[in-house]
Curated annotation (Swiss-Prot):
Its cofactor is a divalent metal cation. GO terms for molecular function: metal ion binding; UDP-2,3-diacylglucosamine hydrolase activity. A divalent metal cation 2 binds at residues 75, 106, 197. InterPro entries: Calcineurin-like_PHP_ApaH, Metallo-depent_PP-like, Metallophosphoesterase_sf. One of its GO terms (biological process) is lipid A biosynthetic process. Binds 2 divalent metal cations. PANTHER family: PHOSPHODIESTERASE YAEI, TRANSMEMBRANE PROTEIN WITH METALLOPHOSPHOESTERASE DOMAIN-RELATED. It comes from Aquifex aeolicus (strain VF5). This is Uncharacterized metallophosphoesterase aq_1054.
Length: 261
């Protein structure tokens, strides 16, 4: 009984132990000496339970790391956002020089698409729904909706292949997709996939056993093909009870370094 109570208490505390997971990727697609820093604040699950403490976690990392781009790979919203516009305003204060981009996760559909889109836009994010945008001379960011929206009867834009096959692959192509899956035939069009959703399984053994069979990985970085990667965040918040065990929350920082001519 004592051990169960101790584990329960620790698993709640762990939800506050935010880690910053840093990765550096080199590419010939950016000129030598060019660096672009991207921050992924995935799975904040903002709503009646996860509130300003989660946004403050994100803001502290943002202010320290000073990313060029801020992305949110789904499940930013998780609940009735009535009277919570101040959370959107807190996020709107973050203004990276190359922009803010988000995609929809499953929870944005569960709690209502319109209020979710409204919140994300008030927070200053451009929501990518089956589209790709050129950021500068070297970078493309694409995003697709989460597939759960279709099951719930929404019109969704989920086909990454349809989006990616039209991008300029001479540029460095990043795909934002909530669940860490990608069609095999789409990999040749993309350089980096940023995802969330898994929470590292919430309990580490769930991630290492079950989720790695379902998704590309439950956390961290995996090479999909030579020079092509997926990076999965364990997320900032939690979608159920605020509990984690050996799967602490994280924010991902990816630095893309050029080594081209």
């Amino acid at each position: 009984m004592f051990i169960a109570v101790l584990l329960g208490a620790y698993s709640h505390l762990e939800t506050y132990f935010l880690r910053v997971e840093k990765y550096t990727i080199e590419t010939e697609k950016l000129p030598k000496g060019t660096e672009i820093k991207i921050m992924n604040a995935s799975d904040m699950h903002l709503g009646p339970v996860m509130r300003e403490d989660r946004v403050e976690m994100v803001k502290r990392v943002y202010e320290r790391e000073k990313p060029d781009i801020l992305v949110a790979t789904g499940d930013t919203v998780d609940g009735n956002m009535k009277n919570l516009d101040y959370l959107a305003q807190m996020l709107a204060e973050l203004n990276p020089p190359l922009g803010k981009f988000a995609v929809l996760g499953n929870h944005e559909y569960y709690v209502g698409l319109n209020q979710s889109l409204d919140f994300l836009r008030k927070a200053g994010f451009r929501v990518l729904r089956g589209e790709a945008v050129e950021i500068n001379n070297f970078l493309v960011i694409a995003g697709v909706d989460d597939s759960d929206g279709k099951r719930l009867g929404y019109r969704v834009f989920t086909d990454e292949l349809e989006v990616l096959k039209n991008v300029d692959t001479k540029k460095y192509v990043i795909l934002l997709k909530h669940k860490p899956r990608i069609k095999r035939e789409a990999i040749k069009y993309v350089d980096l996939v940023l995802s969330g959703h898994t929470h590292g399984g919430v309990l580490f053994f769930v991630g290492y056993t079950i989720l790695r069979l379902i998704f590309e990985t439950d956390r961290g970085i995996k090479e999909l093909a030579p020079g092509k990667y997926i990076i999965v965040s364990k997320g900032v918040g939690t979608g159920g009870p605020p509990m984690r065990l050996l799967s602490p929350p994280d924010v991902v920082i990816v630095t893309i370094k050029g080594k081209g001519n």
